[in-house]
Amino acid sequence: MNASEHIVDAYFRLVRGCFTLADKKVIKGNNRQLDVLAYHLKSREAFHIEVGVTHQQNWCLSIEELAPHFDKKFFGTSPERKGAVDGMTDFEKGKSYWSKITETYENVGFNPEEVIRVWVTWIVRGVDGRSPINVEFYSNHLNRTFPIQILSLRDYVLPQLQNEIGTANYDDELLRVLGFVKQRELQSAMIS
């Protein structure tokens, strides 16, 4: 789990009150994994969260530019590319991992039809990210529409998590650092 996935995992645990499972391998998925799966016991909501974060603003995508990433990560399409030998890439073979993704959901007890898909990115170009962004995504290869929630790590997840963590979390280095940063900001504001 990389740092941004760790932050998102902590957000779903501490802010949303979910149990989480990170880096779940897709069953027979040829090096595919689901970044974070989360489950909220009271509401019985099941989440599949994918994290695509870069903090350089010029690399941040618009909602339209995120579509191929949704199709690959949530719905198992293979990215369009050509192999050195014609017909050898998953794309050229027309391979889809959708059935393996749904099998993986079922393997952890999720109903594939009820999974809430969440994409986390640094920011979405051209959109205010201070609250969740809900979009309807049409998957061409599945011929249906799915709701996807997009969260800005910079504008939504980090502030929510910093408000929740306080100054404890001694066993989690990443959360401890976020706690230090929050306290620095609070104490610096008092001095100014």
Locations of regions flagged by a protein language model:
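Intrinsically disordered, low-complexity Ser/Thr/Pro/Gly-rich regulatory segments
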Residues: 1-34, 38-192
